[in-house]
Structures are given as structure tokens and as C-alpha cells.
From Swiss-Prot:
Family per record: Belongs to the universal ribosomal protein uL11 family.
Subunit structure: Part of the ribosomal stalk of the 50S ribosomal subunit. Interacts with L10 and the large rRNA to form the base of the stalk. L10 forms an elongated spine to which L12 dimers bind in a sequential fashion forming a multimeric L10(L12)X complex.
Biological function: Forms part of the ribosomal stalk which helps the ribosome interact with GTP-bound translation factors.
Name of the protein in question: Large ribosomal subunit protein uL11
GO cellular component annotations of the record: cytosolic large ribosomal subunit
Post-translational modification: One or more lysine residues are methylated.
UniProt xrefs under Gene3D superfamilies: Ribosomal protein L11, C-terminal domain, Ribosomal protein L11/L12, N-terminal domain
Record's keyword terms, sorted: Methylation, Ribonucleoprotein, Ribosomal protein, RNA-binding, rRNA-binding
Keyword Translocase: no
Database matches in Pfam families: Ribosomal_L11, Ribosomal_L11_N
Length: 143
């Protein structure tokens, strides 16, 4: 018989930097899950990634206090900021442009994000990422 699921916990945790402090500790603690076990497993799985890269993770909590977790790809905004070489997006996205991204950079990001996007093909995924870039105040070239 399958384990009974008691809830899901969604967090964004920096790669390789999971520790019991907030937000991880309180979120897992209120469900009675082993915080250090999650931190060690998460840090081991994100060992090869760029340290500090935010990784969305969905933790499935079971009635017997066990858990499983699935990691998703980094947020598109993080990847776009990294590609454009900026710290943050524009406060007035359609007025003030803060950087540029090329079609090649958008395709690279779309390939990374394709598993998490609902786009039918790569071109649709590129258009989705381009829309995110425009809403951040980035100038999109070649789309």
C-alpha cells in the first residue's frame, strides 16, 4: 500500500547551502520531518551546481514522518539576470531597459527550463522566456 501523503512544502533553496535555519527549519519542523536529513540530501544532489543558485524544491511529506523531494530548474529570472550580467530587473520594465539578451542566450535558457515549461516546442519556450525578459526590462534581440 502506498504511503499516505500529508502535505507538500514548496521552497526555493540556494544550491549547496541548505541549512536548518529559516525558511527550511520551520517549514520542515512543523511537519515533524528530519531537517538535517533533508539538508544533507539536498546539498549532496546540488553539489555540482553553481553555489548559491536558487533551486525550487517540492518536498512531499508522508504520514510516517518520511519525505521525498523533487528539484526543479532555476527560475527564469535568475538565468536571465545571469545572462544579461545584471543584479536586478528594471523598476519600470517597458520604459527603462537595463540590459540585453540575444536569441542564442534565450535558446540556451529555454533548453534548461524546457522540462518545467508547458511550451510545445523550443520556439514556444523561447517566446515564453523572451516575455519574461521583457517584463524584467531587458531588451530582446532577434525574437
Amino acid at each position: 500500500m502506498a504511503k499516505k501523503i500529508v502535505g507538500y512544502i514548496k521552497l526555493q533553496v540556494p544550491a549547496g547551502k541548505a541549512n536548518p535555519s529559516p525558511p527550511i527549519g520551520p517549514a520542515l519542523g512543523q511537519r515533524g520531518l528530519n531537517i538535517m536529513e533533508f539538508c544533507k540530501a539536498f546539498n549532496a544532489q546540488t553539489q555540482g551546481m553553481e553555489p548559491g543558485m536558487p533551486i525550487p524544491v517540492v518536498i512531499t511529506a508522508y504520514a510516517d514522518k518520511s519525505f521525498t523531494f523533487t528539484m526543479k530548474t532555476p527560475p527564469a529570472t535568475f538565468l536571465l539576470k545571469k545572462a544579461a550580467g545584471i543584479k536586478s530587473g528594471s523598476a519600470k520594465a517597458h520604459v527603462d531597459k537595463v540590459g540585453k539578451v540575444t536569441r542564442a542566450q534565450l535558446e540556451e535558457i529555454a533548453k534548461t527550463k524546457q522540462a518545467d515549461l508547458t511550451a510545445a516546442d523550443l520556439d514556444a519556450a523561447v517566446r515564453t522566456i523572451a516575455g519574461s525578459a521583457r517584463s524584467m526590462g531587458l531588451e530582446v534581440e532577434g525574437v
